[in-house]
């Protein structure tokens, strides 16, 4: 993941919170139970938390309220500016992404929501291998994102979006890198993690991977 999505992130920054509230009918199901998804990620995290894709700070705020120490990473300047308005003044957000970031001294949990699909499957593997080196035994990765049980589930979801006239959603599903559960299970296990997948709406699953 380089800078190819930064323009999209900057453009989306000022409307992102309306998206997650379900105001765009095409993405209403993608963000169904949004607050519950964030809470689930928070509840599965512990200790010092490295968050990728801070966005407008929604997950970050919940992590801080839960008493976590958070190190935030966000590539978009516009997103960082909006998040800083919502978060405590002393909280700093570092420019970076899933593959290129300043490494904090000690991390217990790595979290992200609605962002890991910006990486190709090969890049996902590189990222998870890197995180495996950062985490001690018992450390965790907790990612919530749109993924699919298998190819058939993906194909049916794309076709359903087209049938409903949700052409922007269908295009999104076909142009970004939404992966399959077997792919992610292999990536995690090959890098020394035990992983479980929990579905929280039609699109989003929470991946909870524990370093062995």
Curated annotation (Swiss-Prot):
Coiled coil region boundaries: none
Enzyme class at the top of the EC tree: transferase
Gene Ontology MF terms in the entry: S-adenosylmethionine-dependent methyltransferase activity
Annotated binding of S-adenosyl-L-methionine, by residue: 53, 74, 97
EC number: 2.1.1.-
InterPro entries: Methyltransf_25, SAM-dependent_MTases_sf, Uncharacterised_MeTfrase_YrrT
GO biological process, one term: methylation
Keyword Membrane: no
Entry keywords, A to Z: Methyltransferase, S-adenosyl-L-methionine, Transferase
Claim: Protein biosynthesis is one of the keywords in the record: no
CDD domains assigned to the protein according to its UniProt record, in alphabetical order: AdoMet_MTases (cd02440)
Function summary: Could be a S-adenosyl-L-methionine-dependent methyltransferase.
UniProt record similarity statement: Belongs to the methyltransferase superfamily. YrrT family.
Name of this protein: Uncharacterized methyltransferase BA_4603/GBAA_4603/BAS4271
Species name: Bacillus anthracis
